[in-house]
Curated annotation (Swiss-Prot):
This is Ribonuclease 3. GO terms for cellular component: cytoplasm. The gene is rnc. It holds the Pfam family Ribonucleas_3_3. Its EC number is 3.1.26.3. Belongs to the ribonuclease III family. InterPro entries: dsRBD_dom (IPR014720), RNase_III (IPR011907), RNase_III_dom (IPR000999), RNase_III_sf (IPR036389). It comes from Cupriavidus necator (strain ATCC 17699 / DSM 428 / KCTC 22496 / NCIMB 10442 / H16 / Stanier 337) (Ralstonia eutropha). CDD domains: DSRM_RNAse_III_family, RIBOc. It is found in: Cytoplasm. GO terms for molecular function: double-stranded RNA binding; metal ion binding; ribonuclease III activity; rRNA binding.
């Protein structure tokens, strides 16, 4: 297997290429698979990402740092990075796994990426693994807001309204559709002060509330700046110095 192209995409060349080959080997292919490397890489990845976040975001507290890290190392995030690296083209899978589309499966790709991190750690140590992780994650971190990453729509809406001293939204289930085993919920979300009223649907009440909250947040973020602008204009109008009316008698005396 020629892995030169992958090493070029990684920006790292292995002194022991067999480690990279093992990192790309699924247990369905052979006994020399990547699960132990995956275990090792998971720990290295968590440590390196924590170190990176600690250095980059000095104002985030422990809870926010943990939330951001959890979202950066979860399966979906690893899967997207694996796709960017085109790991599907280099995976070693057993015939059955290959036929069932295992090379596209998020869990297999995410595990392979963690195994690669573990392989780099064994090949050259923690600093080399950390450098690889920074290379992969810095472009992602430059495009996300760490204050909101991983927060659901209901939380974001609540925090936004609280930040502007606006009463919290109200959620009401207004309808359910379908059979008991496949119901669809319809939820209304209102923000009375802003006259926002939107509707969301989902397979559960929670999912419908989240869908409605996302729509409400979009509306609220459009309306609040307008509200603040009007409020400032009104305050400016009230405090603007009014001309003092002249006393006619005083004017006559001055003319004398």
């Amino acid at each position: 297997m020629n892995l030169d192209a992958l090493q070029q995409r990684l920006g790292y060349r292995f002194s022991k290429p067999e480690l990279l080959q093992q990192a790309l080997t699924h247990r369905s292919h052979s006994a020399q698979h990547n699960e132990r490397l995956e275990f090792l890489g998971d720990s290295v990845l968590n440590c390196a990402v924590a170190d990176m976040l600690y250095g980059m975001f000095g104002k985030l507290d422990e809870g926010d740092l943990s939330r951001v890290r959890a979202n950066l190392v979860k399966q979906q995030a690893l899967y997207e990075i694996a796709q960017m690296l085109q790991l599907s083209d280099t995976l070693r899978l057993g015939e059955g796994e290959l036929k069932s589309g295992g090379f596209r499966r998020p869990s297999i790709l995410a595990d392979a990426l963690e195994a690669i991190v573990g392989a780099v750690f064994l090949d050259a140590g923690f600093d080399a693994a950390r450098a690889l992780i920074r290379k992969l994650y810095i472009p992602i971190l430059e495009q996300v807001d760490p204050r909101t990453l991983g927060k659901d729509a209901k939380t974001l809406l609540q925090e936004y309204l609280q930040g502007h001293k606006i009463a919290l939204p109200q959620y009401n289930v207004i309808a359910t559709h379908g059979a008991a085993h496949s119901q669809q919920f319809e939820v209304e979300c209102t923000v009375p002060k802003l006259e926002v009223r939107v509707f969301g649907t989902g397979a559960s009440r929670r999912a419908a509330e989240q869908a409605a909250a996302k729509l409400a947040l979009d509306e609220v973020q459009k309306l609040v700046p307008q509200l603040l602008k009007r409020s400032r204009a009104e305050r400016t109008g009230k405090t603007r110095k009014q001309p003092v009316p002249q006393d006619p008698q005083l004017s006559l005396r001055l003319k004398e």
